[in-house]
């Protein structure tokens, strides 16, 4: 019986009758039950690793056949069909116990062996470089695979096996350690220089992958995520990542010298020599069925390797450059080397992409720096530059790199990457900042009444900014903006550009209103009223303007002339025209608003005061061209001025000096009417005092010759408020009197 037990042909445990089925057992049987009862929790509570109770290791065919035959013979019982003697039953129980203990010991030995292998593997694995000897990875993988001893297949119950989950966790941890070691060894091999020894070391490592994958799949069936496989793409990515870093370090050194082109050729030659053997090894492993890796042919591997290699090189080189190197200069140097050296297509593509990324990075950095400087200058107050605003120059410098980026289609595609701001968005930000800065600075200058700085802003700084905004508008409105977000930003740029285009006209309008306001305040404070304008007529006309006229006109107009110095006449004319119109208009409005009445002497004095405007324009310090002065004096406001003076100079004679006239229209001479010369712009000096009683005939002839020149009728210079100006005369006709009905009245005041 002992020999039968050693042979392993024992009956199966699954059909053993329970010992508790014999209530009348002996003491020895009860002792046996007490000894074996401690193991029942293992027998009935042990989970099965696979469905149907099949163990997850291969079972020999002969063992299975003997096992089934013995089980069938055991079920048949004795040949005679009689009952089993009690002594034989006791021996049978002892034999079953011994058989069970033997199976448990064999199972414990196998578990201890695999646990010892897993613990030893986790302790001895290190991230060091691979040694020159044979790789221990295949042996480690075989040690961790479960191969139970012969006869140790223990089926405890239907669908149950003994040890899968006992070893699942340590083997899963060991598989993770193996994965880390393989990855580190692949990285270490990638850092090695190209040599024949590199291929042999890589071959040893790659041929160990099938055993690792077998272990990984079995461990994965019990512990999901225990370890990852090493497909061809991962192997190539690990190798090219390290080799790309090595190539990038060589190129970084060459960028600081002058041998970049030669270094590129040398790197490509070395990788080209190494590539056939390396791809042959990777392709051989990929084609093996046990590895489970499938990839295309050698051409696909070749292209994939070159692409991954130079992509890793470009990424590493970009990191090596850092923010302390000029990306634009590096991109130009690298582009020049690519154009001179004959390189693989994948190399040129990846390095050209790196050049564009560097240019994009340079543009973004320069825009950021310039934008921050512009914001700092805008917050710093007025610029110290005498001819231009420093903030305007900084804002203007933001546009050229953005325009270059929009003009370059390939660079524009790189800008459209989600991680980087697009040039269209930066252009919109620049336009918004420019518009807000201009409006704020214009309001600041006008509030402080600094017309020189204001005119410098709109005549010197605004035109270049407007030109850049229009260029950005033309590029942003093209159909090449394919992205929807770019099209939306382009619409916003169009709206802002339209607002900026209206700034010159709107600014001059606001400037004219401010000039009118300042002049009105000055006339309100300094222009006299009352008797000053109602004096009797003197024999000599006034020869000097009043003090208030020079004070108010020079206070408002001189800063304007100072701000326009150095500008071309085309830029001076609009601002001066607005300023003159505002000042003279405020002068006339002040007279009408306060109802100042003028005698003939007062009207002549007012005419002399108006001459201050022309005298100021003719001063040499302002360097105004004669054509510009002539253009300014052609303004319609001076025609209104001449009309107002004409109304005031049409003074009727006082009542005491009026005598009865014959009823004839041609005899009406009591009203002195002046005529303007041919040019209304020179009428400020052509309106002379009319003839009054007591003047000499010589003075009368001279006055008539001065005022008798050809020109338009006085009605041509009178505006809609003609009656208001006529009402300001000291001596007036009746409101209903008309010149052609003068013969109907006996006197002007009747």
Swiss-Prot record:
Disordered, as annotated region? 1-29, 687-714
Q: Which residues form a coiled coil?
A: 87-110
Q: Does the keyword Ribonucleoprotein apply?
A: no
* SS bond list: none
Q: Which UniProt keywords apply?
A: Coiled coil
Q: Where is the composition biased (Polar residues)?
A: 693-707
User: What InterPro entries does the entry give?
Assistant: CC142_N, CCDC142, CCDC142_C
Record protein name field: Coiled-coil domain-containing protein 142
Gene designation per UniProt: CCDC142
